[in-house]
């Protein structure tokens, strides 16, 4: 007696079927979805794409947040850029594979079964239906007509009739799965090909996107190289009590020859979009101050950000009154409204001035021309967003379709004891009470019609 060893092809076929069965397991899909949700929440709670010093300051080793979450753990696990890590993308791919396997293993067979014609040829077959009864002297043609009036599609084979409606209720889950696959694909594509950058640019300057904070491995083609942005002007609107109402940037898209391709004024929540790259207004600052010393040309002096003891923000500049910088004055400003404070070399308050004012310090007339604001821009490109929007649109359509009841009705006409008896039964996958009322109404209407015809014939 010999024992036949399984061939390698059979082994791999069995292994493939087992893997497919595991992937199609609903429990695996739910577990993956929960993991994706947990890590997505962590990416929302933990600031993404910040500098090393930021994480060291906000997530120290001692004491670590929750006893374990320090800056080292965040960087080692990639929690500072969750959505671009290999393990998060791997979870998305695995979840997509599970959805695909479930679609082909469960949803398509269910749709195929729903589309097939299932005729009952024996009265005993109606006993397995939760809703079934018989109509003595019933008219099968009348019942067919009543079903057709209610949107049922009729199929007939001899004395047996099969009717169905709501087939889109079986198509809905397939569309839902397909929509989720499109969303996952868009998220993965965006992570691979998108980038995120930040710039602080003074008014009048032109720049090209270069300060990349995050980018995917395939993002180089998305980063603009043949065009840049010119900041024509930056300004802030203030409320009556001096609080910031909104800040604006007048931006021009220019090519490498300086020609303007597009122009738009942006503000918070109103970005500029050009060739798949979006420029958001997110911050502001004061880049410099233009001054004139006596009759000298107008000079633009840089201003540095300063933190006050109570956490406030100021900007300061040193205005030299001698060519060797041995004497001068300090200028401090809080915002772009124009009020500036000047201190002399000893730190004494000299004057509070506005743009256009002149003050004398160390025998030098200092004329304050204007403050130069700088705009803070966030620059993002995510080619996967259109796919995500498309997926969510299809998802809503699929969910609504899934709520359509798939209802099935069987009829069988049987001759016996000198009279014709109609067996009627049906089932549905949802809205059971409404379905029962519908079938009972059809039965009552058919019965009344049969009695009326019998009286007329008599």
From Swiss-Prot:
One annotated GO biological process: cytochrome complex assembly
One Gene Ontology cellular component annotation held by this UniProt entry: plasma membrane-derived thylakoid membrane
Pfam family, one: ResB
Disruption-associated phenotype: Bacteria lacking the N-terminus of CcsB are able to grow anaerobically but not aerobically, suggesting its function is essential for aerobic growth. In these bacteria reduced amounts of some holo-c-type cytochromes are observed (cytochrome f and cytochrome c550); unprocessed precursor apocytochrome f accumulates but is not thought to be integrated into the cytochrome b6-f complex. Holo-cytochrome c553 (also known as cytochrome c6) does not accumulate however.
Side of membrane Lumenal, thylakoid, spans: 47-84, 192-458
Keywords: Cytochrome c-type biogenesis, Membrane, Thylakoid, Transmembrane, Transmembrane helix
Main localization of the protein described in the UniProt heading: membrane
Transmembrane regions listed in the UniProt entry: 26-46, 85-105, 171-191
Topology in the lipid bilayer: Multi-pass membrane protein
HAMAP family: CytC_Ccs1
Family that this chain belongs to: Belongs to the Ccs1/CcsB family.
Job of this protein: Required during biogenesis of c-type cytochromes (cytochrome c6 and cytochrome f) at the step of heme attachment. Probably not involved in heme transport or reduction as mutants deleted for the first 24 residues cannot be rescued by growth in the presence of heme or reductant.
This protein's name: Cytochrome c biogenesis protein CcsB
Origin organism lineage: Bacteria, Bacillati, Cyanobacteriota, Cyanophyceae, Synechococcales
């Amino acid at each position: 007696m010999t024992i036949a060893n399984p061939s390698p092809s059979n082994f791999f076929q069995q292994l493939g079927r087992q893997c497919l069965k595991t992937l199609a397991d609903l429990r695996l899909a739910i577990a993956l979805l929960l993991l994706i949700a947990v890590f997505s929440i962590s990416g929302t709670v933990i600031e993404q794409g910040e500098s090393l010093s930021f994480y060291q300051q906000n997530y120290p080793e001692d004491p670590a947040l929750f006893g374990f979450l320090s800056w080292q753990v965040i960087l080692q696990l990639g929690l500072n850029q969750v959505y671009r890590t290999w393990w998060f993308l791997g979870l998305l791919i695995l979840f997509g594979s599970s959805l695909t396997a479930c679609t082909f293993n469960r949803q398509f067979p269910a749709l195929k079964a729903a589309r097939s014609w299932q005729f009952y040829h024996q009265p005993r077959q109606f006993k397995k239906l939760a809703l079934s009864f018989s109509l003595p002297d019933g008219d099968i043609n009348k019942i067919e007509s009543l079903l057709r009036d209610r949107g049922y599609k009729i199929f007939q084979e001899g004395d047996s009739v099969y009717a169905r409606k709501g087939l889109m209720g079986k198509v809905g889950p397939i569309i839902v799965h397909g929509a989720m696959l499109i969303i996952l694909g868009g998220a993965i594509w965006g992570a691979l090909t998108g980038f995120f950058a930040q710039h602080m640019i003074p008014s009048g300057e032109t720049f090209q996107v270069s300060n990349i904070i995050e980018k995917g491995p395939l993002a180089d083609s998305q980063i603009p190289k043949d065009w840049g942005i010119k900041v024509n002007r930056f300004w802030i609107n203030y409320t009556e009590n001096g609080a910031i109402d909104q800040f604006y940037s007048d931006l021009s898209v220019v090519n490498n020859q300086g020609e303007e391709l597009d122009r738009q004024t942006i503000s918070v929540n109103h970005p500029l979009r050009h060739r798949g790259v979006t420029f958001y207004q997110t911050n502001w600052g004061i880049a410099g101050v233009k001054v004139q010393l006596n009759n000298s040309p107008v000079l633009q002096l840089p201003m540095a950000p300063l933190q006050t003891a109570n956490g406030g923000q100021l900007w300061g500049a040193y205005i030299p009154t001698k060519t060797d910088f041995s004497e001068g004055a300090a200028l401090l400003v809080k915002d772009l409204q124009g009020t500036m404070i000047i201190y002399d070399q000893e730190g004494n308050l000299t004057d509070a001035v506005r743009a256009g004012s002149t003050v004398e310090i160390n025998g030098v007339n200092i004329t304050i021309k204007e403050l130069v604001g700088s705009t803070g821009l966030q620059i993002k490109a995510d080619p996967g967003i259109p796919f995500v929007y498309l997926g969510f649109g299809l998802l809503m359509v699929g969910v609504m379709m899934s709520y359509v009841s798939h209802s099935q009705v069987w009829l069988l006409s049987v001759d016996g004891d000198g009279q014709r008896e109609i067996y009627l039964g049906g089932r549905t996958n949802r809205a059971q009470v409404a379905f029962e009322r519908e079938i009972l109404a059809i039965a009552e209407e058919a019965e009344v019609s049969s009695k009326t015809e019998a009286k007329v014939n008599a």
